Every structure is written in structure tokens, then in C-alpha cells.
Amino acid sequence: MEKIKEMSVEEKYDKIYDQYILTDVIAMAFVKEMGLTDKYLEYSLKVYKKMMPSIMGSAFKFIKMLTPGRAFKKFVEGLFKDGQVTEPLSTTEVVSLSDREAVIKYKNSVMLKKYRDIIKKTGLKLDLKEYWELFNEAGKEMVEDFGFDMTSHIEEDSAITVIKLKK
């Protein structure tokens, strides 16, 4: 047997990312086919809300102590930092940013491309825009706890997210 060389971090990341999306696509297609979409979203939201403190780390407690404008900016900064898990900064563009609203565009989205490729390869009956809307509903409810409103939609190969400070 030939000596197997260690995968690079980039190769590992790419394979893990593909596996994550494949698992997500399978779950959503199954849930949709079984008519369990509402239950799945309800369950996902419950789990994510419990995990929010560990997902956001120390920022979770800290963000609620700040003035609304500063908390909003910290939240948006956190999205940029954590968002690099699915989108490189090179595809991320801040269309507008104030202490009350942020419009973020992920141009030529790596994540959208991966989802489209995997949905096509698997042949599963899943519409990416429909999936995105469901994903957006769960995200919207999570950020409401922080006093923010969030919407997201797909425009061709880009995803646009708008986050607003309520009040």
C-alpha cells in the first residue's frame, strides 16, 4: 500500500463542508417529503436557542449589556467573523452599515454554489429558494431575542441579508 499523505486543512475543510451540506439537504428533503417542515423548524429553533450561548461565546452575555446601537454593531461584527465558516471574506460585501441597519451581500456565494451542486448531484426534490426561506424563518426568530430583525434572500448567485435594530 502506498503511503497516504496527510490532507491539507483546506481539503479537510472542503470535505467537511460538503458533508455538512449533504446532511442538511438530506434532512430537509426528508422532512419536506414527510410533511414535517413546521415541526422540524420548531425543533431546530428550540435547539439553536439553547445552543446560542455556546455558539456566540462570551459575546452572548456581553451583547445584552451594551446600548442597542453598540450591541447591533457587535452582532454584525460577529456575523462577519463566524460567517467565514461558510463564506470567505472575499465574497462578503457590506452594502450599507449604520448603528441601526446592515445590508450584507455574499456575491458569488460559495455556500449557494455548494448547495446547488449537491442538490443537483443527489437528484433530491429540494428548491434552494424555498429552503432559504425556511432557513431565514428560523434565523429570524433567533435574532429577535436580541432585539433585531433579519431577512435574507437569494438573487442569482448572491445572498443578501438585511439586519435591522428594532425600536
Description of each model-found segment:
Residues 135:
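Active-site glycine-rich loop that binds ribose-phosphate moieties when present
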